[in-house]
Regions:
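Metal-cofactor-binding active-site regions of metalloenzymes
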Residues: 2-139
């Protein structure tokens, strides 16, 4: 019981610590795409390695990355591979983005469609607010 209390207390303090991130893949507002289809947005970064490991072909991955293809058209393909990777460390980042930034507890077609209208536009203010929320100091 005491260990539980100590853990929660320590964890809450650790969450408040600022982070210095010297290895980032965020492009910044001047280089980011302004219109982003939600599946294409959510699979950016290392999660694509998991998709490839799960057997997605490059052609299928190109479909998921295509901003011009509507979410509903690519959902079946995404869902097929998401089920294979959803518990990997990289997919955890995707789940955290959905939960912490967009308020969605699950990844489903309905939740992704709701996110479509909430995709954060790449402005300086939006980028800075994400860093503040994560306690990452931008220098």
């Amino acid at each position: 019981m005491e260990d539980d209390v100590l853990f929660r207390e320590l964890f809450s303090k650790i969450e408040e610590l600022p982070v210095i991130d010297c290895h980032e893949h965020i492009l910044g507002p001047k280089r980011e795409v302004t219109r982003r289809e939600p599946i294409a947005s959510l699979i950016q970064g290392y999660v694509q390695s998991d998709l490839l490991s799960a057997g997605i072909t490059q052609k299928e991955l190109d479909i998921l990355n295509n901003n011009e293809i509507e979410t509903e058209e690519k959902w079946e393909l995404f869902e097929k591979f998401w089920k294979k990777i959803e518990f990997t460390a990289y997919a955890r980042v995707t789940r955290l983005i959905m939960k912490d930034i967009y308020g969605e507890e699950e990844i489903s077609l309905q939740s992704i469609l709701r996110v479509r209208d909430k995709i954060i536009l790449p402005t300086e203010e939006n980028y800075n607010s994400l860093f503040e929320k994560a306690h990452i100091e931008v220098i």
